[in-house]
């Protein structure tokens, strides 16, 4: 994340290198195709999948909380947030309303719902907890990270309160809701956020209870380095960040224990290029394949670095990203079946890391793999085959949006329309932006803000999963200058005004080239 330096409107405008404009134009092409395709998917595939009788979104034929609510619904929300706010605030938001009305079962903990027969499907306790935790971590957190303290935050808060109210597992440190390491890793990620968003002590107390439960094992190191087990790596990293931010007494203890975890994984669980295996030591069958969650795990390492104030693992991350240039990772078969989900997860992790450790070889790898296997950008936009709505395909849509916003540096054009292009690139002075449209367009160019602080209550932009990374952000109270590179005109705006949106008009086929500082 970069917050720009601001200069007065009267300052002498710096010269913009032609290469910066060329890079922004190329980013506009990449992001324009991606966002227009996502908008097609939203209207042609996803919104029609909402059941007209219940209002639920049975994206894969079911409404449950382990897959549909956790992995499909959040990226329906992201797609609407980026390309159609009316859809977000209409049928997409209504899914949130009806799932609470129909599915709440144990207080506000939901259960799956048979939308065809109109009845709840009540699982055993462990599955109930697992599904609700999945919904919070993969679903609601992802939405809250981009919408802030909206109704999705209220839902997240309610479920977490009741998950811990009904915790049944006795430990020497107090009751916890599960012995499942995946659930507990998810809980660490949720509780750390809720603590900083609310200031309520019970959330960090519960998170410490989980950390103490695992660190009570003298040599605790998670064995599974991919999903359904690796969640605790990033969860412990984020907890350390929050402990450090709030000068809590356990911060130093957790720092030492977590370094042992990280060093052991590097020593035993990585190949020579820094990519992680599915299992820390086992190499039989699928265990010997590379984990598509390698980037998720390194997010925890970078969070550790930022928390302790030393770049202990940054070089390891940089080297790993640079090694992606090697032929071995060209169209690597992450899931063993060339699933879109394997590519999408691996690339998502890489984007999180590139946001913190920019490495040219890593950006090139991401662009190439996205174009071929996830966005599939060689297909004509008007006739391109769209993604489905089941969870593996929805994860693809997630990463398409993340990749597109990397190329816009977090800028969003509202309303989006097919044929619009928007791209941006950093310069030493700020940002260069290129926009064009094949049809007349008028709307607002909306800039990102430091959501980590404004929404999440984080002192720093702690590296974390289940978010849209911050690229170029504006400080609400600061003054910025937008310069038209073709006319030379300069327009002052505050960060708040830029976040709400700068009014623009595009003539068909005529590019607007702008610089902001």
Descriptions of predicted regions:
Residues 4-516:
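Glycan-recognition and catalytic cores of secretory/periplasmic carbohydrate-active enzymes
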